[in-house]
Amino acid sequence: MLEEAGEVLENMLKASCLPLGFIVFLPAVLLLVAPPLPAADAAHEFTVYRMQQYDLQGQPYGTRNAVLNTEARTMAAEVLSRRCVLMRLLDFSYEQYQKALRQSAGAVVIILPRAMAAVPQDVVRQFMEIEPEMLAMETAVPVYFAVEDEALLSIYKQTQAASASQGSASAAEVLLRTATANGFQMVTSGVQSKAVSDWLIASVEGRLTGLGGEDLPTIVIVAHYDAFGVAPWLSLGADSNGSGVSVLLELARLFSRLYTYKRTHAAYNLLFFASGGGKFNYQGTKRWLEDNLDHTDSSLLQDNVAFVLCLDTVGRGSSLHLHVSKPPREGTLQHAFLRELETVAAHQFPEVRFSMVHKRINLAEDVLAWEHERFAIRRLPAFTLSHLESHRDGQRSSIMDVRSRVDSKTLTRNTRIIAEALTRVIYNLTEKGTPPDMPVFTEQMQIQQEQLDSVMDWLTNQPRAAQLVDKDSTFLSTLEHHLSRYLKDVKQHHVKADKRDPEFVFYDQLKQVMNAYRVKPAVFDLLLAVGIAAYLGMAYVAVQHFSLLYKTVQRLLVKAKTQ
């Protein structure tokens, strides 16, 4: 039998019997000539940043899941159920996001451009409006953000092409394309998120003591340092509130120089406070006030507070607004500061539009509008200075708030307006006859734009979400060191959520590694199994009826020779 098989094989090779040769040699040829899939194309690993997940006042916000293991699709696909929906920021809309959630998508991955500063302004404004709505809608769908690279962009385009072809083809074409197309399985490396216990929110304070008796009035200058956006690891908070912290540090530098000399040492205590947890209902400020007003007998906040100035989002725009919960009465120091702000803006910077915005505190809201409301609740005169007219402006809580959104000249100008107005109040310069158009900070005492820029660069070089800044972070130690250069008694204050009834709860798994594996669909395995079964069936029939096959081949060979 083996000799006969060898003879048949030899005759097939000599006579080039195409049908049988095709059947016998095709599988081996395909295995030999098929190029192996490059490792880079077979799998791609990239970093993803999860959407916010936190509880505030017992109310859950953001996404509640972190685990992802499902096949990729784009919005062009008709069926999104249990699929990882890829979206590019430039094509993103809230309607598409809601559609993916309604269809029970397995996950959503939003691809961000590499250079956020180059994103068109209309796209930036639209996404800033969408972010609060995304967070307000609690969802069980994992939502991730990824920064675009060439491999990820290629994955998106291939997935988009496959999704689009399925929606516009016939059933047979869809089946064929589904069987032959390449898909991508998206898998995260982390585990399910869980609550972080005993998380501390840290704040930093420092002071400049006034010259004179013990019962000197105190001016408090406050700015919260933490940033907020739809994804904590992408929250740089340049304007909100890196600009406020930059101004606070520059004011500390300027007044520390004035308080160094007896001739310019004013009869006011200056208390500087860089608060944490500002984006979470000002938790750092709340605990700081409780510690100073309820749990101690010696505090500058208990004695004689002239007013509290909160700085929030002052790095761009051509206007400044002083937000108050109660309009200041004439004859008070806070009213004098309001008038000095108006005077400096009108005479030294006429291009700046200044106004006072009055808004009552709404205790029915889960989150206070502005930081000064924390002080107003404790009956301390306070206001917030910002270039934003409304606390609902999306610029206060967006991952789009990057370094390029802060204009250096505008930040320097606003710092000068604040410093000039404070100085005129503290030293009573208007009553002493100083012309309103005469600047105080000139020559060696002028505002340093380079200093403001370097601080802004440092602040926006790292995410400052409250979930990422612990008490031992390099950011806090650097901030504390910076304040120690100019102020006395610099120290940290910590707030930890109550275990029984926590006001805030943070969750982990905010940054993960995601793998995109190139895979064939399940129907491809089915068709492949059918093809293999058919081939094996043909081979089985050929072996079982080898004598018939042998005679047929001989007859064909004889006919070929006679011709």
Swiss-Prot record:
<keyword id="KW-0472">Membrane</keyword>
<dbReference type="GO" id="GO:0016020">
    <property type="term" value="C:membrane"/>
</dbReference>
<dbReference type="GO" id="GO:1900108">
    <property type="term" value="P:negative regulation of nodal signaling pathway"/>
</dbReference>
<comment type="function">
    <text>Component of the multi-pass translocon (MPT) complex that mediates insertion of multi-pass membrane proteins into the lipid bilayer of membranes. The MPT complex takes over after the SEC61 complex: following membrane insertion of the first few transmembrane segments of proteins by the SEC61 complex, the MPT complex occludes the lateral gate of the SEC61 complex to promote insertion of subsequent transmembrane regions. May antagonize Nodal signaling and subsequent organization of axial structures during mesodermal patterning, via its interaction with NOMO.</text>
</comment>
<feature type="topological domain" description="Lumenal">
    <location>
        <begin position="43"/>
        <end position="522"/>
    </location>
</feature>
<comment type="subunit">
    <text>Component of the back of Sec61 (BOS) complex, composed of NCLN/Nicalin, NOMO (NOMO1, NOMO2 or NOMO3) and TMEM147. The BOS complex is part of the multi-pass translocon (MPT) complex, composed of three subcomplexes, the GEL complex (composed of RAB5IF/OPTI and TMCO1), the BOS complex (composed of NCLN/Nicalin, NOMO and TMEM147) and the PAT complex (composed of WDR83OS/Asterix and CCDC47). The MPT complex associates with the SEC61 complex.</text>
</comment>
<protein>
    <recommendedName>
        <fullName>BOS complex subunit NCLN</fullName>
    </recommendedName>
</protein>
<dbReference type="GO" id="GO:0005789">
    <property type="term" value="C:endoplasmic reticulum membrane"/>
</dbReference>
<keyword id="KW-0325">Glycoprotein</keyword>
<feature type="topological domain" description="Cytoplasmic">
    <location>
        <begin position="544"/>
        <end position="563"/>
    </location>
</feature>
<dbReference type="GO" id="GO:0043254">
    <property type="term" value="P:regulation of protein-containing complex assembly"/>
</dbReference>
<dbReference type="GO" id="GO:0032991">
    <property type="term" value="C:protein-containing complex"/>
</dbReference>
<dbReference type="GO" id="GO:0003140">
    <property type="term" value="P:determination of left/right asymmetry in lateral mesoderm"/>
</dbReference>
<feature type="transmembrane region" description="Helical">
    <location>
        <begin position="523"/>
        <end position="543"/>
    </location>
</feature>
<dbReference type="InterPro" id="IPR007484">
    <property type="entry name" value="Peptidase_M28"/>
</dbReference>
<dbReference type="InterPro" id="IPR016574">
    <property type="entry name" value="Nicalin"/>
</dbReference>
<feature type="glycosylation site" description="N-linked (GlcNAc...) asparagine">
    <location>
        <position position="241"/>
    </location>
</feature>
<keyword id="KW-0256">Endoplasmic reticulum</keyword>
<keyword id="KW-0732">Signal</keyword>
<dbReference type="GO" id="GO:0160064">
    <property type="term" value="C:multi-pass translocon complex"/>
</dbReference>
<feature type="signal peptide">
    <location>
        <begin position="1"/>
        <end position="42"/>
    </location>
</feature>
<dbReference type="GO" id="GO:0050821">
    <property type="term" value="P:protein stabilization"/>
</dbReference>
<dbReference type="GO" id="GO:0009966">
    <property type="term" value="P:regulation of signal transduction"/>
</dbReference>
<keyword id="KW-0812">Transmembrane</keyword>
<comment type="similarity">
    <text>Belongs to the nicastrin family.</text>
</comment>
<dbReference type="GO" id="GO:0061635">
    <property type="term" value="P:regulation of protein complex stability"/>
</dbReference>
<keyword id="KW-1133">Transmembrane helix</keyword>
<dbReference type="GO" id="GO:0043022">
    <property type="term" value="F:ribosome binding"/>
</dbReference>
<feature type="glycosylation site" description="N-linked (GlcNAc...) asparagine">
    <location>
        <position position="428"/>
    </location>
</feature>
<dbReference type="Pfam" id="PF04389">
    <property type="entry name" value="Peptidase_M28"/>
</dbReference>
<dbReference type="GO" id="GO:0160063">
    <property type="term" value="P:multi-pass transmembrane protein insertion into ER membrane"/>
</dbReference>
